[in-house]
Amino acid sequence: MTMNRFALTLTTLLLMGCGSDKDATQALPSVDNTAEVLAFYETHADFFRAGSIDDLPEDLVWEDGADLPEVGSPKAKKGGTEYVRLADFPRTLRTVGPDSNGSFRPWILDDTSMALAHRHPETLDYFPGLALRWAVDTDSKSVFVELDPKATWSDGVPITADDYRFTFWFFRTRYITAPWYNNWYESQYTGITKYSDHLISIS
């Protein structure tokens, strides 16, 4: 039994040694799909709309969550380490698409990404994330959002309205191999409007 294990281990190591790491060191070619995305915007101009500040409803009531209490107790001891276990081995590092909805997803998306606004755990009202402030227009079933001009991606590039327009292209495209997301973003929203680099509405 022990001899068989040794032979199997040795064979595995030999096979691994025969492989070439040439493919592992080659980076995938970068793809500039700007033309494709812009063409999609034009083809779906009824969804990807453009406006100006003058087009905003005059009676919007803006909110920013400034009246909400601090999250957690000020007496709580900050810092420390929490140890948890994963229910299964990560099937993928994708956040959308095949096998992306596993128990590892909260660690790379749900619990780590920043949304436009987040729910306060006590009051359940919203406080800012990437949004500076927001307003709801019930007549048009739209949410108007002013993005925080200080918000950036991890590389320091500012987050703008174009990023949110691209988000809707991304979730509607068949490239992601995620029919549920395709259906949701095509059926539950009627459009996104860009008023400026930091002002959008989602309907």
Give the residues covered by each predicted segment:
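Bacterial Sec signal peptide processing site at the extreme N-terminus
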Residues: 20-31
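Surface-exposed binding/hinge segments that line
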Residues: 22, 77, 181-203
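Aromatic- and charge-enriched surface segment that lines or borders ligand/interaction sites
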Residues: 133-177, 201
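C-terminal motif of bacterial Sec signal peptides marking the signal peptidase cleavage site
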Residues: 16-17
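N-terminal lobe/hinge region of extracytoplasmic solute-binding protein
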Residues: 49-70, 79-138, 169
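Short, surface-exposed charged micro-motifs
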Residues: 74, 133-135, 191
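Second-shell loop/turn segments in exported
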Residues: 70-73, 146-155, 188-190
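Sec-dependent signal peptide recognition
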Residues: 2-11
